[in-house]
């Protein structure tokens, strides 16, 4: 069916009031202009984004918000981070009740199918002649090595609004900054700076996403920490490809 649109002057406030036909029903919203960026405040049939629901797409179970599904107290995940799967914890490997590390993931991260987070207990002793883990397998006479003899890289920390591509592997102790992008099939063994794209095995820097000034503005603005209502109103800014307009808008709001 071809889309239909009605337009009328807004009775209150500036801009125009639109109604349009979509998926079997009329949708309405007010359009306003701020510093050249169109902002649309949608009336969403009474539904608000809820970080505590498991399935953000009704009737589709292959994409979930991660936070409400977590059982392991050493996995900490922020609001609205999702994975393209029906389960998250199976993607965190070598993570046992006695493990000393944590995995900490921020808000609004996008984790593609097949991504794996490898934790520190995947490591074997490397300062001896053999790396074979005799102490973990029944029948062998070996005590567990001292913690100082085992590689330990610390917690794995993923920032906010990070996109991790399909089948990427994040190794123990890696820290990935806000807004970074991890290319599909990458193996990330080193830290990734905010708003940086890395690809490959081992993952190497492809480029920064933005210039240093815009990165600094985004890190100070921290849109992911704002209320759902405010983030909703910021969507036209967050999805605007005119970076100079975005830059001026952020400066005006800081």
Predicted regions and their residues:
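Aromatic (phenylalanine/tyrosine) cluster motif
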Residues: 17-18, 42
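Positively charged N-terminal leader segments that act as targeting/secretion signals
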Residues: 5-17
